[in-house]
Amino acid sequence: MSEEYIRIYDTTLRDGEQTPGVTLTPQNKVKIAIQLDKLGVDVIEAGFPIVSEGEMDAVKEIARQNLSCEISGLARAEKKDIDAVMKCDLKYVHTFIATSDIHLKYKLKRTREEALQKAIEAVEYAKSQGLVCEFSAEDATRTDREFLKQVYKAVSDAGTDRIDVPDTVGYSNPQYIDTLIKDLKSVVNIPISIHCHDDFGLAVSNSIAAIEAGASCAHVTINGLGERAGNASLEEFVMALHCLYGKKTRIKTELLYETSRIVSSLTGIVVQPNKAIIGENAFGHESGIHTHGVLSNPLTYEPINPEMVGRKRWLEAGKHAGIHGVSAMLEEYGLTPSQEQLKEIVSKVKDLGDKGKNITDADLLAIASQVMRQEGLEQRIRLSDFVVTTGMNVVPTASVRLLIEEKEFVGAETGLGPVDAALKAIQKITDELANIKLREFRLESITGGSDALAEVSVKVEDKDGHVASARAAGEDIVIASVQAMINGLNRIMHKRTVNKDKELRKYTV
């Protein structure tokens, strides 16, 4: 690989899976591996084969996929661990041993000399088996500097192809990382990787500092997954390199959001809304000043074009809303109120926001319809009937009958629960029509008790990036969820029609 490209070593399937609450099936690990390869990572750390038969089977299955990127396996500085990696038909081993005094004393109960010898033996064995070898001194940033240099020099002399510098408990800062990498470059003449944890929120900053100091590779995870506070986030690291430092990677940045969503879905770890690059709010605007600026020139309040990372910007009405933002939102639905009507709509939106209400597209359209004295949106999709079955030892199943422009369609699906099954059945029916994805689902109890009135809010998106929010309320959570989804679908369909009409008008003489 040309040195002008920074190497991306993705450890989502190993370190990322060590996130509390995450356990991936072999099938899901393969799905993520295929997506990571599509994204353009240079190396996938597929797992830690020695830990279990299931882990070994998953790594073997990933190795069988004939992916374009390199596939590595983790191994302690033990012959049996390295053998386990080879049993998976891998040609790349990432081997490690702890070198800090606290780890040596309390975990390994070894002397420095013993740890050094184990490191050398592991590298020599891996190379004798024809493997590509990357060596990590675990807890490197808390290891005595002179001893650390001695370890890395020794494994370099033993033949390791690369060394990796782990900031195992995220205890470093960029200045420390800078001096450390430069020190190590003075004793080894092989490529250096950096592996940072985010315990103090500095994982990405520390990784960038390492690259600036001469490292050529970073170990990262999708969505910053990992033990405790997680690892350096691939999407943040890559975009910072591209946009702030002018450094290249092989990553297809337009696939970052797609990859983030796939990993979030399969791991069950929700991405925080305000997370940089891939959080739901990263390209969302509610403030009137901001929406006005973005509509005039997106660079006023966006550092990058959202399409660079597979995103679309979106606007939301709220108590900070302004005339320009609300006007743009209504225009998506083909509504063009007069200036006086627009002022009244904005005033009513602000009143609702001041009362603490989260304003959906449905609320905005209801206000606009009232002020403009127009009927609501045409309901192109209506619920005719649906049935759900669930219980102990029963796979939740839903059958849904929809009327789409007065034609009847029926779909059935299974799910993790009755709501999941019902929403999947709706998506199955409407897939060819709109290819809708559920981006957000929120359930709130409006009243107390077991018969509480529940409110369901959803945000849906189609393949063209049209986004709509909707809500529904009722005593039955499943019915409310289904109705909210259908409301969202109708709004998407209306946006698509308006957009299509605009495109046709462009070519009308």
Model-derived features with residue positions:
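Catalytic alpha/beta core domains of metabolic enzymes, predominantly
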Residues: 172, 178-296
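Non-catalytic terminal/interface segments that mediate subunit docking, oligomerization
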Residues: 18, 31-32, 359-468, 472-477
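Short beta-alpha connecting loops at secondary-structure transitions
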Residues: 68, 104, 167, 220-227, ...
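Alpha/beta enzyme core
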Residues: 3-8, 18-43, 57, 61-65, ...
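Mixed-charge, glycine-accented linear interaction segment located at domain edges/termini
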Residues: 466-469, 473-502
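A mid-to-C-terminal "edge-of-domain" accessory segment
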Residues: 5-6, 12, 245-412, 450-453
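Active-site beta-loop-alpha junctions enriched in small/polar residues
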Residues: 14, 49-51, 74-78, 98-100, ...
